[in-house]
Design a protein with these regions (language model features):
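Glycine-rich phosphate/pyrophosphate-binding beta-alpha loops
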Residues: 18-19
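NAD(P)-dependent Rossmann-like dehydrogenase/reductase catalytic/cofactor-binding core
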Residues: 1-12, 23-29, 33-162
Length: 162
């Protein structure tokens, strides 16, 4: 597909695309996993996102089953979705995982190459930054954002019920 050595570059971009696809599956299934938010009462204040129509969010969905349906003939079907469905069958609540997502370097290299080439890659960049955020390295920044909100508007942190 190109001169000698180009294969490594092509594989690197392949892995960057993979980061984006994985993030899209994870985000979409996360929306479905939280589709029951309207089943319980929520405080309506400046610290929460009020549901305009709670009855639109009263679904208790079988996420492993949805992944299985999607992988069989859907436009989003792929080997990655096959693996996603298998993981959800094995551990539907994903309790065996911490949620810290490593990057092997290829996604990072893809984004750096895009910057050097002046080529926009918002999806691939967001997927890489999502992996960074999963490691808790944004905890200080998030605490600082909370502190600033309290300073300028007296906005105290809303504690999520456990």
């Amino acid at each position: 597909c190109g001169p000698s050595g180009a294969g490594h570059f092509v594989k690197m971009v392949h892995n960057g695309v993979e980061y984006g696809m994985m993030a899209a599956y994870a985000e979409g299934l996360n929306v479905l996993a939280h589709a029951g938010v309207g089943l319980s009462d929520r405080d309506l204040d400046a610290e929460t996102t009020p549901l305009r129509v709670p009855e639109h969010y009263r679904y208790e969905l079988d996420i492993p089953r949805i992944a299985e349906v999607w992988r069989r003939g859907s436009v989003v079907a792929s080997w990655l979705l096959d693996l996603t469905a298998a993981a959800l069958q094995e551990d539907p609540s994903l309790q065996g995982f911490s949620g810290q997502v490593s990057d092997s370097g290829e996604g990072r290299w893809t984004v750096l190459s895009a910057v050097e080439e002046g080529v926009p890659t918002p999806v691939l960049s967001a997927a890489l930054y999502g992996r960074f955020a999963s490691r808790g390295r944004d905890d200080f920044a998030n605490r600082l954002l909370s502190a600033m909100r309290q300073q300028f508007g007296g906005h105290h942190e809303k504690k999520e019920p456990k």
